[in-house]
Design a protein with these regions (language model features):
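Aromatic pocket-lining residues of Rossmann-like dinucleotide-binding sites
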Residues: 22
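A glycine-rich helix->loop->beta "capping" turn
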Residues: 48, 69-82, 88
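Conserved glycine-rich cofactor-binding loop
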Residues: 9-13, 35
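The beta1-alpha1 cofactor-binding region of Rossmann-like NAD(H)/NADP(H)-dependent oxidoreductases
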Residues: 55-65
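Conserved hydrophobic beta-strands of the Rossmann-like cofactor-binding core
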Residues: 4-7, 80-81
Length: 94
């Protein structure tokens, strides 16, 4: 049985590259981003093994929903990569 990865922050950078490479290796991957439009290309390229889910890692309900959708679809989550970041931006003087 194929292992299932859940990777957060797949809209760009490391998360996106890791999702693509993991899918190329034949794993199931839950590809997440706040805006699913940014990950649709990946899901379209791997329709049998990629599941795109909207996920805001700052929102507990969003996290619960994403995990539930992933388990409902693939049966389990074997590997979690917490790649998404959240930053509070302000002037240095503040």
């Amino acid at each position: 049985m194929k292992k299932t990865w859940l990777i957060t922050g797949c809209s760009s950078g490391l998360g996106r590259s890791l999702a693509k490479e993991t899918l190329k290796q034949g794993y199931n991957v839950v590809v997440t981003a706040r805006n699913t439009d940014t990950i649709q290309e990946i899901v379209d390229q791997y329709p049998q093994s990629a599941l795109g889910i909207a996920l805001d890692v700052t929102n507990q309900e969003s996290i619960r929903n994403a995990v539930k959708q992933a388990i409902d679809y693939f049966g389990s989550i074997d590997i979690l990569v917490n790649n998404a970041g959240y930053g509070y931006r302000s002037a240095i003087e503040e």
